[in-house]
Amino acid sequence: MNNSEIININGPLKGEIEVPGDKSMTHRAIMLASLAKGISTIYEPLMGEDCRRTMDIFKLLGVTIEEQDNSIIINSPGYQNFITPHQVLYTGNSGTTTRLLAGLLSGLGIESVLSGDVSIGKRPMDRVMKPLLKMNANISGIDNNYTPLIIKPSTIKGINYQMEVASAQVKSAILLASLFSKEATTLTEFDVSRNHTETLFAHFNIPISIQGKTIQTIPYAIEHIQPRDFHVPGDISSAAFFIVAALITPGSDITIHNVGINPTRSGIIDIVKQMGGNIELSNVSKGAEPTASIHVKYTPNLNAVTIKGDLVPRAIDELPVIALLCTQASNSCIIKNAEELKVKETNRIDTTADMLNLLGFNLQPTHDGLIIHPSEFRSNATVDSQTDHRIGMMLAVASLLSSEPLKIEQFDAVNVSFPGFLPKLKLLENEGK
């Protein structure tokens, strides 16, 4: 990732769009469809770089995956007939692929090596390895914390585990490993994190019990899996950039259709409402993965908010662009209890503050979040995504607050989750003219 992009987009933004399929759900649907013997079709998946890494790995395990227009067809021999890979399983920049497959491959007992790019090599894996080792997984890494992760066959045991952090990736790694255990596994969450693994278990016929923050799988749950088709909703994390762009750009009025509004992911909607933002939902569908159309208009004089507690995991990936939104509030805003931001593609607490402060905004990083003061875009210094897709898109949205072009280094990082992000933003600009 080394290309730069000069962003020169001015408002207002107007029109109707859809965003790519949800990244979290696409990963999980690929994994579960690949485990189930037979044919599953995934409609409207995200075909970004991260999800392609997940597909590539299952191809190496013997799964046939065919891409068609807006869908992928997965023809699996079933988990019982996976082949042992004879090369390193490359996860690229995808923490989801790395951490979830650490659990799944441990459960499968397939000898394998997981390794990613330089960024993945710096991200902690002990949070996944510790519970997996308690489950009798044979998994090791550099300093028992970093990739490459070496996985060898073992017999997975069920555990009763209390989560220490609100992390959907850690939870999912445990649940995926537990599918192959002869004992039940009980997991209690610290705070409820995104529940796509649980909803997709049920969708693919895997028994799972959920009572509040406690989740339980049954012995040998994998034996119940069945192939299923799945329609992936639009990613609310991708929609977030357009929500904020419309809120901060005078005259803007946009609608984003078919966005997933799973309650464990819809924190940004609640935050915008607390700030007094002009946001409305329509065409709301019901079900395990509900969707809606989101209508957003420019809103001046936003209220100050404190974002903390169980709201944080419901908006964890949106917090960088929410921090930008908070610079336009009438008083200082606080984000706290967000330590998880430190172990994303970058330390997003520091990266968000550093990049926005370069542009003249006023953000103070803290040990677990940010203090964001009302401030304006005052400098067109060159900024850098730091190879973090969400930082790159957040900076592009920030450029709407300036009448001058903004140069963003390593902007191609956005392709990890949103190929075509910039053309879609320009489309709304053109509609607004």
From Swiss-Prot:
CDD domains (alphabetical): EPSP_synthase
UniProt cross-references to PROSITE patterns, sorted A to Z: EPSP_SYNTHASE_1, EPSP_SYNTHASE_2
EC number: 2.5.1.19
Binding-site positions, phosphoenolpyruvate: 23, 95, 123, 169, 348, 390
GO cellular component annotations of the record: cytoplasm
Gene Ontology MF terms in the entry: 3-phosphoshikimate 1-carboxyvinyltransferase activity
Keywords, ordered alphabetically: Amino-acid biosynthesis, Aromatic amino acid biosynthesis, Cytoplasm, Transferase
Subcellular localization(s) per the UniProt record: Cytoplasm
GO terms for biological process, alphabetical: amino acid biosynthetic process; aromatic amino acid family biosynthetic process; chorismate biosynthetic process
Location of the active site: 317 (proton acceptor)
InterPro entries: Enolpyruvate_Tfrase_dom (IPR001986), Enolpyruvate_Tfrase_sf (IPR036968), EPSP_synthase (IPR006264), EPSP_synthase_CS (IPR023193), RNA3'P_cycl/enolpyr_Trfase_a/b (IPR013792)
Binding site for 3-phosphoshikimate: 23-24, 28, 167, 169, 317, 344
Keyword Flavoprotein listed: no
Main localisation: cytoplasm
Annotated pathway: Metabolic intermediate biosynthesis; chorismate biosynthesis; chorismate from D-erythrose 4-phosphate and phosphoenolpyruvate: step 6/7
Enzymatic reactions: 3-phosphoshikimate + phosphoenolpyruvate = 5-O-(1-carboxyvinyl)-3-phosphoshikimate + phosphate
A family per Pfam: EPSP_synthase
Broad class of enzyme this protein falls into: transferase
Protein purpose: Catalyzes the transfer of the enolpyruvyl moiety of phosphoenolpyruvate (PEP) to the 5-hydroxyl of shikimate-3-phosphate (S3P) to produce enolpyruvyl shikimate-3-phosphate and inorganic phosphate.
SUBUNIT field: Monomer.
Family affiliation: Belongs to the EPSP synthase family.
Protein name stated in the entry: 3-phosphoshikimate 1-carboxyvinyltransferase
Organism name: Staphylococcus epidermidis (strain ATCC 12228 / FDA PCI 1200)
Species classification: Bacteria, Bacillati, Bacillota, Bacilli, Bacillales
Gene for this chain: aroA
